[in-house]
A protein has these predicted regions:
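Phosphate-binding beta-alpha-beta segment of Rossmann-like dinucleotide-binding domains, i.e.
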Residues: 1-31, 195
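Rossmann-like adenosine-cofactor binding region
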Residues: 60-153, 168
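Short beta-strand "acidic-cap" motif of Rossmann-like dinucleotide-binding folds
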Residues: 55-57
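Rossmann-like dinucleotide-binding domain for NAD(H)/NADP(H)
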Residues: 114-206, 250, 265, 280
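Glycine-rich Rossmann-fold phosphate-binding loop(s) that bind the pyrophosphate
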Residues: 37-38
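Aromatic pocket-lining residues of Rossmann-like dinucleotide-binding sites
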Residues: 47-48, 112
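N-terminal Rossmann-fold NAD(P) dinucleotide-binding loop
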Residues: 41-42
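A conserved regulatory-domain signal marking ACT and ACT-like small-molecule sensing domains
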Residues: 194, 198-281
Length: 281
């Protein structure tokens, strides 16, 4: 446009001719499938309902907090097949692990509507590239938007590659730093875990004078071993929370008495215990 303007071309006319590049379907009345209803997935689902979309969400591990935050207009799917078959648009909000890697593969794509549009700003490995490329070439998948592009994907005209834009405003950069500092302080002072990638979210209001924060493998019998060790010390448990994520679990135990170094050593020595921290207040 700069060159044409310099040559006296009517820029307004040129710009108007370019509007065909931006033609696309409207969102209102379309169905959005949201795979993963965590903090971000819930927000996306709720906003989409306000845009007039029909939203169907899937998350086999939907937390109580997420469920309470989810709009009543969002329909919860019992299985992925429902999402694949009904959605005009699909957005992914999942961690990548052995269960989710390649979740959008050949079978999933075959079950989708013709011309489906897919957004993956979660993890690149959630999409099987070997299945996605021919689907894009045939038009089965009309468009793929991702911030995990590579050379093979970017050769295709219906792929939009984005940088990671999560903290691309001055405000968000400041907020990220403040949030990280607060969450780190909360862990150091209270043992709470918030927004961890590898560990479960665990928070417990103080109800004792001593707190044990125990990282361990997600194996049976560990809680019994912890409470047995405290019972031998004649220490009563005031409150406790235990949550797991994959192979690991985290337990917070509040008591109203000092816990001896011997008891801490006993708990630390139990099978599958990885780390024990003692906090007091």
């Amino acid at each position: 446009l700069d060159g044409q303007a310099a040559q006296g071309t009517d820029v307004t006319t040129v710009i108007e001719k370019g509007k065909s590049q931006f033609v696309g379907p409207e969102l209102q009345g379309k169905t959005l499938g949201v795979i993963g209803l965590g903090a971000i997935g819930v927000q996306v689902a709720n906003i989409a309902t306000k845009l007039g979309m029909n939203v169907v969400g899937y998350d086999p591990f939907l937390s109580v907090n997420a469920a309470l935050s989810l709009s009543r207009a969002v329909r919860w799917a019992k299985d992925l097949e429902t999402v694949w078959q009904e959605s005009d648009y699909i957005t992914l909000h999942l961690p990548q692990n052995e269960h989710t890697k390649g979740i959008v593969g050949a079978d999933a794509i075959a079950a989708m509507k013709d011309g489906v549009r897919i957004v993956n700003l979660a993890r690149g490995g959630l999409v099987d590239k070997a299945a996605m490329i021919p689907a894009l070439e045939s038009g089965k998948v009309a468009a793929y938007v991702t911030d995990f592009p590579d050379n093979d994907l970017l050769k295709l005209p219906n792929v939009t590659g984005l940088p990671h834009l999560g903290a691309s405003t001055p405000e968000s950069e400041d907020n990220c730093a403040v949030m990280a500092a607060r969450q780190l302080a909360d862990y150091l002072e209270n043992g709470n875990i918030v927004n961890s990638v590898n560990l479960p979210a665990v928070e417990l209001p103080w109800s004792g004078t001593t707190r044990l924060c125990i990282l361990h493998r997600n194996s049976p019998g560990i809680i019994a071993g912890i409470t047995s060790a405290l019972s031998q010390e004649k220490v009563n448990v005031e409150n406790m929370v235990n949550k797991s994520k994959g192979d690991y679990a985290y337990t917070i135990v509040d008591v109203n008495a000092a816990v001896s170094p011997e008891a801490v050593a006993h708990i630390s020595g139990l099978e599958n215990i990885l780390r024990v921290r003692v906090l007091t207040r």
